Amino acid sequence: MSFSTIMQQLMSGMISTVSIFLLTLLFSMPLGLAVAFGRMAKFKPLQWLMKLYISVMRGTPLMLQLLVVYFGPYYVFGISLSGYSVFVATIIGFSINYAAYFAEIYRSGIESIPVGQYEAAKVLGYSRVQTFFKIIFPQ
């Protein structure tokens, strides 16, 4: 193999890696925020379900999760993945894994905000949504 052939293959792999990384961030960060809200919800079954999801995702190896996402549809539904669907399965696997980690980061950050900031927003007449997006989320 020549040097240029090797470099072309390496560049192709780098493009795939960067695209997987960017798409994983694009999907896992909002999903993690939704999971964090579910984890902090007052509705106990939802809170319990999100806690279970986070525990399973953080407690099992990523490689095992990727294998389940890749081979699971075949064994459960008889759907064989090939071509572009393999890439999609990879994005789904990484996204659901990293969403659990982002959820804990978001939850701990939100819960660390002093109560006085919520009270100050209430005095200023902010709604709960305004309080979150203008005061809590930027921190």
Residue ranges, per PLM feature:
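Transmembrane alpha-helices and adjacent helix-loop boundaries
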Residues: 1-139
